[in-house]
């Protein structure tokens, strides 16, 4: 019978997609993967679709919640801890891997109490509350970006696990005989500030320099975004969401998007230059730190939302459209910063502590 591994990740795709990459790697090595999540996260959709058994505990975040939630917090933590401990006792995993989300707090503590090796992985350049609290309990601490955690014998810089198909091997065709292609990404829900900004900015780019545009606007905003482009006199293809991200990245020459950890690492994997507009109200401003990983090396342009209006973005776009060699150089730098071995490294570390 295959040995069990328990993965803890939930809430958003930024936690769940890297965890799914690790799950597939564990499976290729002959391990049975189980998943610990919460009832309200995106894992409820994605994990069963991947054919993985999903175990749920009742836990939610406290940051920014009211007094009533804070009063209930100790009881909720105790309840979720007992739920997680029961699941771990039943599964008897050789290792528990936590990749973020509220589930990792009680799940990680339960692993420690059960004597099961715990490995945590932080996707962002600024560690989340749950992962910070688990550092003393973990056997190994993996980070996507250098120096997210304080230096210690536990720390390993692995990069972010991303889908293998994003590591493009074939070079993009030359820009000598076609217009550059601009991909705008707003995430699964869309980014309304980008939906408003891009049509206005592209209208100010000279027509002869204007790129082809594919804009992912989110389900609720696709129609109004398409209308904005039409009113601005800018030709663009607008979609609510993108199913095949590998194909979209392969099509693009430049990406404008937020700076979520997974997105930043996918851009590096795809060797794509980018304009990054960090979410202004992200916890601990972690998206700015994520963006700096690429921007400080010249692989991206960091555009703070509060300081970026249509005219400023139009000027930036006009400049790079006139310099295709700059786009190519930025993409080459992005590829150099990629970590194609990230998934294997994280799984290697888990099995090292499990069997070491």
UniProtKB/Swiss-Prot annotation:
<dbReference type="GO" id="GO:0005886">
    <property type="term" value="C:plasma membrane"/>
</dbReference>
<dbReference type="InterPro" id="IPR004276">
    <property type="entry name" value="GlycoTrans_28_N"/>
</dbReference>
<feature type="binding site">
    <location>
        <position position="242"/>
    </location>
    <ligand>
        <name>UDP-N-acetyl-alpha-D-glucosamine</name>
    </ligand>
</feature>
<dbReference type="GO" id="GO:0050511">
    <property type="term" value="F:undecaprenyldiphospho-muramoylpentapeptide beta-N-acetylglucosaminyltransferase activity"/>
</dbReference>
<keyword id="KW-1003">Cell membrane</keyword>
<feature type="binding site">
    <location>
        <position position="124"/>
    </location>
    <ligand>
        <name>UDP-N-acetyl-alpha-D-glucosamine</name>
    </ligand>
</feature>
<dbReference type="Pfam" id="PF04101">
    <property type="entry name" value="Glyco_tran_28_C"/>
</dbReference>
<feature type="binding site">
    <location>
        <begin position="12"/>
        <end position="14"/>
    </location>
    <ligand>
        <name>UDP-N-acetyl-alpha-D-glucosamine</name>
    </ligand>
</feature>
<keyword id="KW-0131">Cell cycle</keyword>
<dbReference type="GO" id="GO:0071555">
    <property type="term" value="P:cell wall organization"/>
</dbReference>
<comment type="pathway">
    <text>Cell wall biogenesis; peptidoglycan biosynthesis.</text>
</comment>
<dbReference type="Pfam" id="PF03033">
    <property type="entry name" value="Glyco_transf_28"/>
</dbReference>
<comment type="similarity">
    <text>Belongs to the glycosyltransferase 28 family. MurG subfamily.</text>
</comment>
<dbReference type="GO" id="GO:0051301">
    <property type="term" value="P:cell division"/>
</dbReference>
<keyword id="KW-0472">Membrane</keyword>
<protein>
    <recommendedName>
        <fullName>UDP-N-acetylglucosamine--N-acetylmuramyl-(pentapeptide) pyrophosphoryl-undecaprenol N-acetylglucosamine transferase</fullName>
        <ecNumber>2.4.1.227</ecNumber>
    </recommendedName>
</protein>
<keyword id="KW-0808">Transferase</keyword>
<dbReference type="InterPro" id="IPR006009">
    <property type="entry name" value="GlcNAc_MurG"/>
</dbReference>
<dbReference type="InterPro" id="IPR007235">
    <property type="entry name" value="Glyco_trans_28_C"/>
</dbReference>
<keyword id="KW-0133">Cell shape</keyword>
<feature type="binding site">
    <location>
        <position position="188"/>
    </location>
    <ligand>
        <name>UDP-N-acetyl-alpha-D-glucosamine</name>
    </ligand>
</feature>
<comment type="function">
    <text>Cell wall formation. Catalyzes the transfer of a GlcNAc subunit on undecaprenyl-pyrophosphoryl-MurNAc-pentapeptide (lipid intermediate I) to form undecaprenyl-pyrophosphoryl-MurNAc-(pentapeptide)GlcNAc (lipid intermediate II).</text>
</comment>
<dbReference type="GO" id="GO:0030259">
    <property type="term" value="P:lipid glycosylation"/>
</dbReference>
<dbReference type="GO" id="GO:0009252">
    <property type="term" value="P:peptidoglycan biosynthetic process"/>
</dbReference>
<dbReference type="GO" id="GO:0005975">
    <property type="term" value="P:carbohydrate metabolic process"/>
</dbReference>
<dbReference type="GO" id="GO:0051991">
    <property type="term" value="F:UDP-N-acetyl-D-glucosamine:N-acetylmuramoyl-L-alanyl-D-glutamyl-meso-2,6-diaminopimelyl-D-alanyl-D-alanine-diphosphoundecaprenol 4-beta-N-acetylglucosaminlytransferase activity"/>
</dbReference>
<feature type="binding site">
    <location>
        <begin position="261"/>
        <end position="266"/>
    </location>
    <ligand>
        <name>UDP-N-acetyl-alpha-D-glucosamine</name>
    </ligand>
</feature>
<keyword id="KW-0961">Cell wall biogenesis/degradation</keyword>
<keyword id="KW-0132">Cell division</keyword>
<keyword id="KW-0573">Peptidoglycan synthesis</keyword>
<keyword id="KW-0997">Cell inner membrane</keyword>
<feature type="binding site">
    <location>
        <position position="287"/>
    </location>
    <ligand>
        <name>UDP-N-acetyl-alpha-D-glucosamine</name>
    </ligand>
</feature>
<dbReference type="GO" id="GO:0008360">
    <property type="term" value="P:regulation of cell shape"/>
</dbReference>
<feature type="binding site">
    <location>
        <position position="163"/>
    </location>
    <ligand>
        <name>UDP-N-acetyl-alpha-D-glucosamine</name>
    </ligand>
</feature>
<keyword id="KW-0328">Glycosyltransferase</keyword>
């Amino acid at each position: 019978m295959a040995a069990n591994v328990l993965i803890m990740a939930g809430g958003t795709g930024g936690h769940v997609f890297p965890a799914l990459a690790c799950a597939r790697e564990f499976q290729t090595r002959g391990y049975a993967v189980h998943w610990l999540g919460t009832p309200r996260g995106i894992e409820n959709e994605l994990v069963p679709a991947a054919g993985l058994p999903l175990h749920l505990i009742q836990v939610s975040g406290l940051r920014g919640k009211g007094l009533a939630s804070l009063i209930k917090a100790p009881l909720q933590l105790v309840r979720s801890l007992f739920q997680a401990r029961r699941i771990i006792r039943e599964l008897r995993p050789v290792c528990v891997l936590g990749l973020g989300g509220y589930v990792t707090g009680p799940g990680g503590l339960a692993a420690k109490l059960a004597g099961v090796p715990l490995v945590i992985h932080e996707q962002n350049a600024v560690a989340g509350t749950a992962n910070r609290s688990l550092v003393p309990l973990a056997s190994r601490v993996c980070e996507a970006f250098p120096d997210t955690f304080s230096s210690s014998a536990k720390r390993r810089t692995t990069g972010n696990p991303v889908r293998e198909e994003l590591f493009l091997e074939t070079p993009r065709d030359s820009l000598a005989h076609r217009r550059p292609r601009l991909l705008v990404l707003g995430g699964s829900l869309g980014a309304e500030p980008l939906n408003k900004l891009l049509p206005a900015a592209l209208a100010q780019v000279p027509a002869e320099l204007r790129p082809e545009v594919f804009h992912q606007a989110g389900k609720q905003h696709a129609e109004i975004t398409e209308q904005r482009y039409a009113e601005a006199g800018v030709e663009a293809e607008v979609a609510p969401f993108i199913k095949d991200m590998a194909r979209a990245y392969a099509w693009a020459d430049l990406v404008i998007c937020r700076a979520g950890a997974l997105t930043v690492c996918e851009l590096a994997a795809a060797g794509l230059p980018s304009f990054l507009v960090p979410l202004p109200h992200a916890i601990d401003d972690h998206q700015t730190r994520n963006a700096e990983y690429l921007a400080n090396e010249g692989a991206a342009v960091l555009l703070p939302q509060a300081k970026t209006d249509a005219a400023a973005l139009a000027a930036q776009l006009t400049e790079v459209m006139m310099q295709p060699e700059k786009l190519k150089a930025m993409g080459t730098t992005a590829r150099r910063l990629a970590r194609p071995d990230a998934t294997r490294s994280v799984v290697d570390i888990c099995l090292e502590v499990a069997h070491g």
